[in-house]
Amino acid sequence: METRRMLTALLLGSGLALAAAMPSVAADKVKAGVVRSMGGSPNFIGKEKGFFAEQGIDVDIVFFDSAQPIAIAVASGDCDVGATGVTAAFFNLASQGTLRIVASGTWERPGFQSIGFLVSNQAYAAGLHSLKDIGGKKGAITQSGTPLQYAIALAAEKYKVDYNTIQVLLLQSNPNVGTALTGGQTDFAVQTVVPAYSVVNKGGAKLLGWEGDELPPTQNEAFFTSTKMIDERGDVLKRYLVGYRKAMTYFHDAFADANDKRRDGPAANEVQEIAAKYLGQPLEQIKLGTPFFDSQGRLVEKDFVELAAWYKAQGMIKDVDVKAMIDRKNAIMVKPK
């Protein structure tokens, strides 16, 4: 009996030593490009909660100052995936067969905060109190051919303002837009929630309203990847998407009910703390604005078709086949709500 115990102990010890000596399987790395905004939340949550690690994925989050460079980075291979507003540059690159839309990003919906309209204190004092007053004014955004510029056009259409009378200032980065607002070099601006509140909370501008409340519901942000990623690392992409969609569900349930109406769930504070950590912003500021994410990142094709049509009307892109730009093997489609 004693001999048996000794042999068992020896075998167990050898097994443990062998297991310790064996190299662990390295996680597959994925570089995700995002703007420093709440639109990157699924990546923040997936990384922080271990949803990507569960799938054997190690995500490296890369921050950009604006949306356009993310499409270029993904197309060139500097990033594997991107999540941001769908720009004219995206459509131009996708039309060459380099990029594909895989899932939705933030949606513009009533009660949620994603894209905001701000007015400088000087312009407000001069009478610019609502979006119906933007005709003939200067409006600042980061770059041309973005959903931020599209939002100005949609506001002009709703309030019967001639879009061509608005002088759109292209200031390249959110800090530049904030400086222009504070200094009165622009009358109004369009920014996502985090940089918007960065200016408003310092008294540099006033909030006119949110696109989700002011304009019809629309979807103009997306999660996308390169055709090279789909073709050469398809298994990695699928596993990444499992973690990404799990994170989207976690975000959705933290701030929306089963009917997609705004409410705080049990995980609301936790998600806001995660966002504050990754964005380097005070928690109090993060709590001021919450975007909407569909629980599964479903896509509304019509919204992207209309966005592309507007870019084309402005001479920013040529004819593009939006349907061909969607990775239908991985995307989940849905009709407008």
Give the predicted meaning of each segment.
Residues A9-A19:
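Bacterial N-terminal signal peptides
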Residues A26-V161, Q167-L171, D187-V193, G209-W210, ...:
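Short, glycine-/small- and polar/acidic-enriched structural segments
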Residues F304-K337:
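Conserved C-terminal helix/tail region of periplasmic/extracytoplasmic solute-binding proteins
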